[in-house]
Amino acid sequence: MQIDRIKYTMKHRKAFRAVEKQLLGHNTIRGYLHDLDKVFLYMIMDYKRAHKIHRNHSRHHTLKARTHADYVQMVIDWECARLTKPDKQMNARETLDKLYPELKDKVLPVIEELGL
């Protein structure tokens, strides 16, 4: 079991909910469930495998995002990453510009809608 990764993920989940509430005015069911799968995956498998499964199946990641709600969750995730992840200090707009410019047509309107 990867206790440090579980603690890290729990801290990120808390930050996600705080940013979600700040931006949307409320928390969503998806916000409460955000990255919860990782907590359980870290209990039964190594980091690389858990990370791969999570990214391939979670709709708030670029491989699976399809709906407006998916992109809202993605932007919130990008925006809150800098609060708990020392290695990810960009905000949502910077993340879009530097890492995912191919998503600009879908994600930039969401960033602007959220006032970021």
Predicted regions and their residues:
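Metal-dependent phosphohydrolase cores
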Residues: 1-116
